[in-house]
Amino acid sequence: GAGKTTMLRDIVRQLSYKSYRVSVVDERSEIAALCEGRSAFDLGFSTDVLEGVDKAEGMLMVLRSMSPDVIVTDEIGKQSDIDAIERITNSGAAVIATIHGRNIDMIKRRDDLKRMLKFFDLIITLSRRKGIGTVEEALTEW
């Protein structure tokens, strides 16, 4: 891909080392890649990982039980994910997530995803145009 998961890991690590309480909900074991309870990647010292559970259910579980400042997950797309993000952001926690789409205009064409945009303060579009992880745009208004 364009480096979305790698960027997520780096953001998690940076936030954790700045003493934010970070919870990663890793439905498909791609962000943390746990092995015997340890991440294959450096995700920082104050990061909790919930792996192998439904994304929406997992986000709400960590919200209730871990009191995170930030919840991180990948590949948002189902209505239940969007509903969970709404509950999380209404509770005061932040969400950092990835979504597949060429650009913001493509995302805005889907009514369910368009509704989700109001829960985010920043949207970054990545590509591989100048190598994996190329930041094409960083938007604070859409």
Language-model-derived ranges and their functions:
Residues G1-L15:
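Glycine-rich phosphate-binding P-loop
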Residues S16-V62:
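P-loop NTPase switch/communication element
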Residues Y20-R21, G44-T47, S67-V70, S91-A97:
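Loop/turn-to-beta-strand initiation segments
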Residues V24-V25, V70-D74, A94-H100, T125:
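Structural recognition of the conserved hydrophobic beta-strand(s) that form the central parallel beta-sheet
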Residues L34, I104-M116:
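Glycine-rich, charge-decorated loop segments at or immediately adjacent to ligand/cofactor-binding or catalytic sites
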Residues V62-V72, I76:
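Proline-aspartate-enriched helix->loop->beta-strand connector
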Residues D83-R87:
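A short acidic, amphipathic alpha-helical/loop segment
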Residues K118, L122-W142:
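Conserved P-loop NTPase
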